[in-house]
Amino acid sequence: MHQKIIAIILSLMITSALFAQESSEKTMRRLTIGTDILPLIGGLPFGFVGLLHNDGKNEINASAFYFNDDDENISALGFYPAYRFYPKGKGKGKFFEGGVGAGFINWNYGQEKVSSITFWPTVNLGYRWSWNFGLSIAPFIGGNYGIGKVEASDGTIKTFKEDDGSESEITGSLNPSIGIEIGYMF
């Protein structure tokens, strides 16, 4: 009787130890959740989620941000879907990114509340480092072009004062796209 119990316990211990062994093949982390630290430094809440597919050669990204400037009487909610290409795969190394952002802008112009939608076609070049414990850092640089206007019913277009005293519109020009994404990969 004792031999049967010992044999059962021993076989359970051996099989549980066998199934607990790690596979030599590591599964690739596919989901990334994070933020871009440059907008955060400027006080803008910003977050993104990315999903790797095709053995990490491609990534679908979706970003969102919120902006509010009481001095300028303007606020915005933005979404930026993008697609990344990693030439070497595995979701690491050099990447090329293309996307189109949409900004839903509200401007309080006197007694009028102006609402507008702007679009921002963007291209970026970057590099992603990722570690086995999940941390991911991806600096990037590129450019975007703003399409659309934030215009009141009397024809006044929302502008921002620059440091040199000049004024510029929100859209209608080529702008730099710079960032440092920090995320965790699952």
Where are the language model's segments positioned?
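Extracytoplasmic loops and strand-loop junctions of Gram-negative outer membrane beta-barrel proteins
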Residues: R30-T32, W107-Y109, F160-E167
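Gram-negative (and chloroplast) outer-membrane scaffold detector with strong preference
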Residues: G50-P139, Y184
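Structural signature of outer-membrane beta-barrel domains
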Residues: L40-G42, F67-D69, G101-I105, N144-V150
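Transmembrane beta-barrel architecture of outer-membrane proteins
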Residues: R30-T32, G43-P45, A76-Y80, T118-T122, ...
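Outer-membrane beta-barrel "beta-signal"
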Residues: G172-F186
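Cleavable N-terminal export/targeting peptides
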Residues: M1-M28
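Outer-membrane beta-barrel and related beta-rich outer-membrane complex signature
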Residues: G110, E151-S153
